[in-house]
Amino acid sequence: MARIAGINVPVKKCVPFALTYIHGIGITTANIICRSCKIDERKRVLELQDEDIEKISSFIRQKYVIEGELRKKVAMDIKSLMEIGCYRGLRHRKGLPVRGQRTHTNAKTRKGRSKLPIAGKK
């Protein structure tokens, strides 16, 4: 495993796919990073030189919010929505779908399992 931006990425995969193992970087962003650092997208992580890995790491640290920072930012955004009392914040607080999906028959995952009483032995 190679470390890019403090995250272990698989060495046998091509660089863009390996970069997607970092939380906050998808395939499109990974391709942009490869083009910006002038690294062939078909190259595997194993074939990269140390300076290439350092170039990618520094580029990611400068341009993108990743991993723990990103998780913290998303959590703070949701918390602020709940504090100001907007509709999306209320939906988050109640544990319901936020983006307008129907809840009458769907949304089982977001609402959780229903708590039915279990009948005892008669």
UniProtKB/Swiss-Prot annotation:
Q: Which UniProt keywords apply?
A: Ribonucleoprotein, Ribosomal protein, RNA-binding, rRNA-binding, tRNA-binding
Region of interest called Disordered, as start-end residue ranges on this chain: 97-122
- Keyword Lyase in annotation: no
- What GO terms describe the biological role, i.e. biological process, of this protein? translation
User: Which InterPro entries does the annotation name?
Assistant: Rbsml_uS13_C, Ribosomal_uS13, Ribosomal_uS13-like_H2TH, Ribosomal_uS13_bac-type, Ribosomal_uS13_CS
Record GO terms (molecular function): rRNA binding; structural constituent of ribosome; tRNA binding
GO cellular-component terms in the record?
Answer: cytosol; small ribosomal subunit
Q: What does this protein do?
A: Located at the top of the head of the 30S subunit, it contacts several helices of the 16S rRNA. In the 70S ribosome it contacts the 23S rRNA (bridge B1a) and protein L5 of the 50S subunit (bridge B1b), connecting the 2 subunits; these bridges are implicated in subunit movement. Contacts the tRNAs in the A and P-sites.
Q: Which family does it belong to?
A: Belongs to the universal ribosomal protein uS13 family.
What interactions and quaternary structure are annotated?
Answer: Part of the 30S ribosomal subunit. Forms a loose heterodimer with protein S19. Forms two bridges to the 50S subunit in the 70S ribosome.
Q: What is this protein called?
A: Small ribosomal subunit protein uS13
The organism named in the record is: Wolbachia pipientis subsp. Culex pipiens (strain wPip)
